[in-house]
Amino acid sequence: SVFSNLIADMEIEFRLAQKDPNGNCTQGITRTNAPSASNSPSNRNAPKSVINWDPYSYLNIWVVNSISSGSGGNTLGFAQFPSTPQSASTYGVVIRADEVGMIGSASSADGRTLTHEVGHCFNLYHTFQGQCGTTCQFSGDLVCDTPPQFDDLNNSCNFSNSCSNDINGGTTSNPNPFTSDVPDQTENYMGYAIGCQALFTPGQKARVYAAFNSY
C-alpha cells in the first residue's frame, strides 16, 4: 500500500474503570433504563444527562438502543470534540448498541465505529473535512499526511482519487510526505469506509497528543 509507511501506533490503552467516582468498586459498566431519554437531533445530550462520570477521570461512552438522525440518514454514533464549547459533563461518545462488540446483534463493523468516534473525542476530523481544501495545514482535517478527500466516497473501499492537491502545504511540525498525487486514504479510521478502516497516521497521532496537552 502507498500508505504502509504512514501507519502510527497511537500508544493509547483503554481499560474499564475499576472504581466509580465515589471510590466504590465497579466493572466499569453501568446499565440504566431511561426510555424518556430520547436522543433526537434537537436533544443529543439527553442520554448524557441520565448518568455521567467526571470526564477528567473517565472517558464516558453511552451505549444506546437507537439514535434518531432526523433526516432519514443512518447515525451510528456521535461524539463531542474537546474544543466544543459545551459542558464537560457531555464530553464523550454516544453509540448504538449494535455497533459495539462482535457477537450477538453486533454489526460487521468490528468496533471501528467506536474507534472513529473516539477519534473525534481526541480532536480528529473526518478525512473528507472541507473537501479538497487548499493547503493541508490550513484546511481539510488539518493533518498533512492524510491526503485531501472530496467526500465520504459513499462509504466505499473502492479505489478513488478525488483531489489533486495532495502535495500542497506542510510544515516542520505537520509534514506532508507526498511528492505526487496519491489515492484517497480509505483505510483511515476517520473516513466512512468502515469495511477497510485499519490505520491512523503519525500526523493524526501528533494532533491527538497536542489535544491531550491542550485540554
Language model segments and positions:
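Solvent-exposed, flexible loop/coil residues
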Residues: 33, 82-85, 147, 193-194, ...
